[in-house]
A protein has these predicted regions:
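N-terminal secretory signal peptides and thylakoid transit peptides that target proteins
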Residues: 1-18
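An exposed, glycine/acidic-rich loop-and-rim segment of catalytic or binding clefts
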Residues: 2-4, 42-410
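Bacterial N-terminal signal peptides
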Residues: 18-25
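Signal peptide processing junction and immediate N-terminal pro/mature segment
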Residues: 27-40
Length: 410
């Protein structure tokens, strides 16, 4: 994916999207922005938009709620003076992401709840750390080392995001991590052998840190004892760059570094094909409004009620193994997100199954298209497809992965 596009091409794109002159200018400026990686840091040094004020890095811990079993759930809030992240020990969940727009107006741009019962009883996975296996496994079944394992079915006839009680519904242990460059929390959960049908005792630590340049870095680390297992950890944060509950994301502009994707069947299970995006509604190689082709009659869009597909990330990795997966921007207010990862795929979900029944923070109803998710990952149902990258983790091996959400404005 090119670091910038010719201005004439950007203006043609803006015209196709029905954007006005001001929005077209914002689109042009954002498209011309470049991103580089600071040597040895593994985090992007943004060359566009407002740069973060080097404010004081702060973190605080407060009680949030208590589970029915009497286990305390805490909320950690950490900030660099410009961007503020709130996370729960329940599900190692991102509850809030507060960022300014180009005028300095701060909004929460992530979906979430303000009470524990909604997180516990409902299943939208708002902001949750997902495991032991993110995304779908066909019929909840896979075979490893000659043994067939069954995961509880919770999504049609398939298993989704680790089964009926995944890592999103566990209380994680938390430890503050802070130095002179970043601040955040390391969350740890030990999943016993056989939990949700998965083999092996899996110890997972997921560390969320915010640096002075508005980069939210997620470092995943896992080891297994006793038996081999499968692992696919991710985070299911939902974003709306207008601010949560402030309208749809259909006018958000997306540029994806993904020349291919994995088509699915009617149950949203990959067919095994790795198909080119060229000539399809899945081609976001140039900046395109999310809603432009969303309601087309392409079979894949019909299956997902929109976008709910794994994209195969392209391009070359930097010295830290990271590749740019995609860029989002909202031209009216100017907020942007760039996502870097070392994972082979990313699930782009356009909020198709939000139906107004979820009342989020401030009692706002979340409706179809009110947010998007961008989940870095190995491919869905990988254990049942030999041509997909392996998700097997064996005793003595270490699972490591990094994803960075870089917030900005233009």
């Amino acid at each position: 994916m090119p670091d910038h596009l010719p201005r004439r091409q950007v203006l043609r794109t803006a015209g196709a999207l029905g954007l006005g002159a001001a929005a077209a200018g914002a689109l042009s400026s954002t498209a011309e922005a470049a991103t580089r990686t600071t040597a040895g840091s593994g985090t992007p040094d943004k060359l566009h938009g407002m740069r973060a004020h080097h404010g004081k890095l702060e973190i605080r811990k407060n009680p949030f709620d208590t589970t029915p079993d009497g286990e305390a759930v805490d909320v950690y809030t950490f900030t660099n003076g410009r961007t503020t992240i709130s996370m729960l020990t329940w599900g190692a969940t991102i509850q809030r992401v507060e960022t300014p727009d180009r005028r300095g107006h701060i909004e929460n741009i992530s979906l979430g709840f303000d009470n524990l019962p909604d997180y516990a009883k409902l299943s939208p996975y708002f902001g949750a750390t997902i495991g032991r296996y993110g995304n779908r496994i066909a019929k909840g079944r896979f075979t490893l080392d000659g043994v067939t394992y069954q995961i509880p079915i919770n999504n049609g006839e398939n298993a989704l995001h680790g089964g009926t009680i995944g890592f999103d519904k566990k209380v994680w242990k938390a430890k503050v991590v802070q130095d002179d460059r970043s601040v955040g929390v390391a969350f740890t959960y030990v999943s016993p052998d056989g939990e949700m049908g998965f083999p092996g005792e899996l110890t997972s630590t997921v560390t969320y840190t915010l640096d002075r340049r508005d980069n939210l870095r997620i470092d995943y680390h896992a080891t297994v004892a006793g038996k081999a297992t499968i692992v696919n950890l991710t985070n299911h944060v939902y974003f709306n760059l207008l601010g949560e509950g402030n309208g749809t994301i259909y006018d958000h502009v997306l540029e994806l570094n993904a020349p291919k994707y994995t088509p699915v069947d009617a149950g949203l299970i990959p067919t095994g094909e790795i198909a080119p995006v060229a000539g399809t509604p899945f081609d976001f190689s140039k900046p395109t409004a999310i809603g432009l082709r969303l309601r087309g009659d392409h079979e894949q869009l019909v299956f997902g009620r929109g976008y709910d597909h794994n994209f195969v990330i392209g391009g070359h990795a930097d010295s830290n193994g990271l590749r740019l997966a995609g860029r989002f921007w909202e031209p009216e207010h100017g907020r942007t997100i760039e996502v870097l990862t070392d994972q082979p795929g990313v699930q782009f979900y356009s909020g198709n199954f939000l139906d107004g029944t979820f009342l989020g923070i401030g009692n706002k109803a979340y409706r179809q298209g009110d947010a998007f998710a961008f989940e870095t990952q190995h491919f869905p149902d990988s254990p049942n497809h030999d041509n997909f990258p392996s998700t097997v983790l064996r005793p003595g091996e270490t699972y490591k992965s990094t994803t960075i959400y870089s917030f900005g404005t233009k």
